Structure formats: C-alpha cells, structure tokens
C-alpha cells in the first residue's frame, strides 16, 4: 500500500465520486481507517455540494476478507448503501462511487451518532432480523452477484467445539456491533457494509450480543426478543456463537492480565 493520500488526492477522489468538478475540499479529518482502508470526514464547498460527507478509500493491501479486491468491495458497499434503505435497513446515503486503476472510493453522507440508549441494541436486533429476512432476489443483479461471490466473515479466536449444522444462509452484515451501528435522533443507522455476504445469520446476532464487552443479561434478552418478533432463529447455533465469543473474551482477559 502506498503512502497516506494528501489533501489534493482526497479532493480528486471526492470530485470523482460526487461527479462535481468544482467541489473544493476545506478540511479532511481521519475517521477510522480500520482493516487497511482509509476514511475521512470531509468538509467541502461548491455549487450543489453536500457540505459535510465521508470518503472511504480502498487500495491494494487492505484486509480483503470478502475476497473481492478494492474495486469489488467498494462497489458492493456503495450498492448496499443505495439499495438496502428501501428494504427497511437504515444506512448512510451513498453520494457516489469511483475507481481508477486498482483503487476505488465511495462518498457517503456523514452520520452523527450519539450514545446508545437502553433500547438501541433491541432496535438493532429488529433491523438485523429484517436484513436476514431478505433474499438475494431483493437486490439488484450486480449487488446480488457481488454478495454471492463474497467470503462470509467467520474467523474468530476462541472458536469452540461442537458447532451445530448450519440450517440456512442469509444475507450477513459480518461486523454487526456498536462500532458499526450509529444511534441517531431518528433511530439507528447501520454502517460499513464491506463484509456483506451470504452466511450464518446467527453469526450476526451473536456479534450484536457478545462483541461489546459488558452487555448485561436484560439488554441481551431484549435484543433476542426484538429479533424473534420479526423472524425465528436457530437457538442451537446462537448458543454456539455466544459460547465462541465467551471463549474469545476469556482469552482476552488472560492476555490482558499478563
């Protein structure tokens, strides 16, 4: 992966994504950049410009969990933002996608999140159940093809024996926990669709219940009830996914104590 892009490079990517040659970058603050991608919160000006937006850049060398490469992953993310909101999945508004050579970027509306309330996890569980109730036929052919080619997220330290058989595959977000679920005044907004694939729905629900440290029993139970109100779930696989997470956290505690 080449060096960190300068402001001129960021501005050029914004212009390509938004289709606005007169757009001018006023400021760009790093925001995340996990898994080898680069993300900035940007302030821009120019006729018709959105004012504040987010740019995410994909380059060779990023952690390509889905196996689609920079362009395929960015395209999948952009299409997911454009399509899923029409199916009851709240996402940031996609402002554009662009690629050049072996690099790609997407621009999206900035989402200002607030602290989670006691009911945020349950709300997120209901949205997750809606996602799991969708089928690839609900997606555009291009997005469905990218999703079907994606390797589902699965790797986790602490995986335990006794995995039950997988009864169904559904659309799977792949990284569904507080870091990618923004609480807003209008409800939640689900971020970061790089790992969207066909996989185990209980991976997602287990992630929501266990990937954040310190989720209490009442909060987790409320989330399970909210999910169950929308669709049935595999209790055996959910128990196994949660057991895997508990093994992971036990390992983390031991590691932190050293």
What are these model-derived regions, one by one?
Residues 1-28:
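Juxta-kinase regulatory segment immediately upstream of eukaryotic protein kinase catalytic domains
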Residues 29-33:
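Protein kinase glycine-rich loop
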Residues 35-44, 49, 53-55, 161-203:
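Active-site acidic catalytic loop and adjacent metal/ATP-binding pocket
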Residues 51-98, 116-130:
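A conserved alpha-helical element in kinase catalytic cores
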Residues 62, 115, 181, 198-200, ...:
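Conserved protein kinase catalytic core
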Residues 85, 132-136, 209, 228-231:
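Protein kinase-like catalytic domain
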Residues 92-106, 110-171, 195-198:
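A cross-family kinase active-site recognition segment
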Residues 202-233, 245-258:
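Active-site activation/catalytic loop segments of kinase-like enzymes and analogous catalytic loops
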């Amino acid at each position: 992966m080449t060096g960190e892009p300068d402001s001129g490079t960021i501005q050029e990517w914004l212009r390509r994504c938004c289709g606005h040659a007169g757009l001018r970058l006023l400021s760009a603050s790093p925001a995340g950049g996990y898994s080898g991608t680069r993300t900035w919160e940007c302030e821009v000006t120019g006729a018709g410009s959105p004012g504040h937006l987010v740019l995410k850049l994909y380059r060779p060398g990023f952690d390509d969990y889905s196996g689609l490469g920079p362009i395929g992953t960015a395209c999948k993310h952009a299409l997911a933002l454009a399509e899923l909101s029409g199916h009851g999945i709240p996402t940031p508004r996609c402002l554009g996608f662009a690629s050049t050579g072996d690099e790609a970027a997407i621009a999206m509306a900035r989402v200002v999140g607030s602290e989670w309330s006691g009911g945020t996890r349950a709300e997120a569980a209901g949205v997750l159940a809606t996602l799991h109730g969708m089928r690839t036929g609900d997606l555009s052919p291009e997005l469905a093809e990218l999703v079907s080619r994606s390797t589902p997220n699965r790797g986790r330290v602490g995986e335990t024996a006794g995995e039950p058989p997988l009864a169904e595959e559904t659309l799977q977000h792949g990284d569904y926990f507080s870091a990618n679920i923004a609480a807003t005044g209008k409800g939640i907004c689900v971020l970061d669709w790089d790992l969207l694939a066909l996989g185990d729905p209980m991976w997602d629900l287990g992630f929501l219940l266990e990937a954040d440290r310190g989720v209490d029993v009442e909060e987790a139970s409320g989330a399970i009830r909210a999910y169950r109100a929308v669709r049935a779930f595999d209790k055996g696989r959910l128990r196994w996914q949660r057991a895997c997470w508990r093994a992971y956290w036990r390992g983390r505690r031991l590691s932190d104590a050293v």
